[in-house]
């Protein structure tokens, strides 16, 4: 262990929230991934800022995660610092028609809070398995809704260590992208502008979406969510199915039989199994339909 670097980290964040050689399989929804050299869980935006400053000063690589959805960490793990903005930074509060959330708040929890306040517009996100930090960065969406429809502002940490607020017109939100992703900003919090609605109708709609997910998505197995981005004019799952890959397996990883757009950890898969399966899917889909599938899942660590 790099003791001097550990000492620097623990000068800005409590020791009980600094972990050494932490298995990433505990922190990703795929349930795979080797150890991160350091794993920290800040509980305030100032702690995030200070940890990043220390990493930069030491030339230490770092990576920000939320609840570990949409992420594939290699079996070798990560040589650097994983900064998890999740349970220690997940406060949500309602102010009129605004819902303000820290970056680690789960989308499902924010949707529940909005429902409790009879605010409509965020139902689409109630089943997306991620935090609002990641959702802002990639303009997450489902069932016809996207973050860009409801985001009022986002508080970020810039590359120069400044904490600033970006208004909706500054966010440059597109399909699975934003100015946050383009500039490498770190999301610290967000404000959503919603509309007054009927609590019963909001709940009914959320229940309908939940039923769709349970019926159509392989929620009973670990996965990272949708594995590939939607190619323009196509659906990734349909292209994968048309290539004859429903149920296709490499080691413990499998193309879900329930929904071909999902790669699942069927049986003690390794990250290498999942990566090879994704590679094979890309090759077969390209051969069958001529379409290049681009991963939606982020890869991290040495292969």
Please give the residue ranges for each predicted region.
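Anion-binding (especially nucleotide phosphate/pyrophosphate-binding) glycine-rich loop
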Residues: 2-132
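Conserved active-site and cofactor/substrate-binding residues in soluble primary-metabolism enzymes
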Residues: 4, 25, 43-46, 105, ...
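Alpha-helical scaffold segments in soluble metabolic enzymes
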Residues: 8, 50, 109-113, 153, ...
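Phosphate/pyrophosphate- and phosphate-bearing ligand-binding catalytic cores of soluble enzymes
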Residues: 19-20, 71, 157-276, 283-284, ...
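Structural signature of FAD isoalloxazine-binding scaffolds in flavoprotein oxidoreductases
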Residues: 33-34, 40-45, 72-90, 137-168, ...
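Short, solvent-exposed amphipathic alpha-helical segments in soluble enzyme
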Residues: 55-57, 245, 280
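Short, basic and Ser/Thr-rich N-terminal targeting/leader segments
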Residues: 58, 65-67, 150, 221-222, ...
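Short Pro/Gly-enriched beta-strand edge/turn motifs at strand-loop
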Residues: 135-138, 173
């Amino acid at each position: 262990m790099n003791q001097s670097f550990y000492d620097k980290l623990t000068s800005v964040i409590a020791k009980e929230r600094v972990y050494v050689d932490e298995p990433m399989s505990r922190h990703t929804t795929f349930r795979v991934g080797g150890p991160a050299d350091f794993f920290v869980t800040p509980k305030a935006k100032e702690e995030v800022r200070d940890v990043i400053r220390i990493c930069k000063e030491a030339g230490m690589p770092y990576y920000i995660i939320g609840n570990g959805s949409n992420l594939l960490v290699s079996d070798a793990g990560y040589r650097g610092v994983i900064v998890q903005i999740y349970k220690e930074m997940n406060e949500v509060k309602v102010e009129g028609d605004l819902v303000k959330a820290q970056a680690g708040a789960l989308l499902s929890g924010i949707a529940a809070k909005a429902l409790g306040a009879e605010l409509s517009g965020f139902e689409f996100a109630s089943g997306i398995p991620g935090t609002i930090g990641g959702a802002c960065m990639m303009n997450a969406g489902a069932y016809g809704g996207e973050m860009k429809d409801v985001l009022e502002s986002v508080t970020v940490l810039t590359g120069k260590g400044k904490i600033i607020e970006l208004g909706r017109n500054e966010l440059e939100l597109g399909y699975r992208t934003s100015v946050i992703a383009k500039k490498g900003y770190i999301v610290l919090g967000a404000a959503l502008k919603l509309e007054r609605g009927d609590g019963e109708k909001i709940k009914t709609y959320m229940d309908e979406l939940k039923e769709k997910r349970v019926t159509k998505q392989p929620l009973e197995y670990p996965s990272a969510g949708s594995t590939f981005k939607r190619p323009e004019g196509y659906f990734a799952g349909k292209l994968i199915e048309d290539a004859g890959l429903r149920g296709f397996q490499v080691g413990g990883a499998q193309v879900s039989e329930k929904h071909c757009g999902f790669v699942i950890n069927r049986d003690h898969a390794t990250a290498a199994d999942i990566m090879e399966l994704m590679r094979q899917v890309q090759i077969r889909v390209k051969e069958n339909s001529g379409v290049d599938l681009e991963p939606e899942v982020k890869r991290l660590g040495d292969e």
